[in-house]
Amino acid sequence: MKQYGLNSAEYIKCLFIDYLLYKKENQIIGNEFMYGLKRKLVDLVVLKKNRTFAVEIKSSNDNLIRLEEQIREYKKIFDYVLIVTTEKHKNNIIEKASDDIGIYIVQDDLSIIKFRNPSIQKNKDKIELLYSVNARYLCKIGNYTYGKYNADELRSLFAKKRISYIQEILFTYLYEKYNKKFNLFISERGVN
């Protein structure tokens, strides 16, 4: 059965996208990005000022059983981690999320309040970062012939590079993946 309002993660996602767009910051928003070794999905990815933001949406109907694991995984890859939730889960999320996680609360009147600013994540994992980037893209930027190395071998070659370079690769990959789609979304939506 389809859920609406604060019981729907999709509805909250739309509200949060509107919230971000209203701020008129130079950013790109991407929907449902598959990341890391475990190939899990993050609800939203935001690219801003050469930084990556993972956004996890928790509606009133969602349970929080996997939240701590999700946060742990996001911290390995993304520069900042944000949780957007409702009043119902506010206290539980404050308890479960460390102080470096940003928290936004969607009120019953559908306004969004920033409860806590995120801090930058410093302990990234090279392999998790590399498994978030498509192997064909790695071939392209590394000038490798596709098929010469399998995906694991290719990622092993890149793992020898410094982590800041790998973070740049991820940002550029995400930018190329989402930029055109986001700009099309903005032009069709009528937001300047």
Put a short name on every predicted segment:
Residues 1-7, 187-192:
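Interdomain/boundary linker segments immediately adjacent to catalytic/signaling cores
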Residues 4-49:
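Active-site metal-binding core of divalent-cation-utilizing nuclease and nuclease-like domains
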Residues 28, 34-35, 45-46, 101-108, ...:
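Positively charged, polar, low-complexity stretches
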Residues 33, 58-59, 86:
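Structural motif
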Residues 52-60:
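Active-site ExK catalytic segment of metal-dependent nucleases
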Residues 61-62, 120:
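Short, surface-exposed beta-strand-loop junctions and turns on beta-sheet-rich folds
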Residues 62-106:
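Catalytic cores of nucleic-acid endonucleases
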Residues 111-178, 182:
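A conserved mid-domain beta-alpha-beta active-site/ligand-binding segment of alpha/beta enzyme cores
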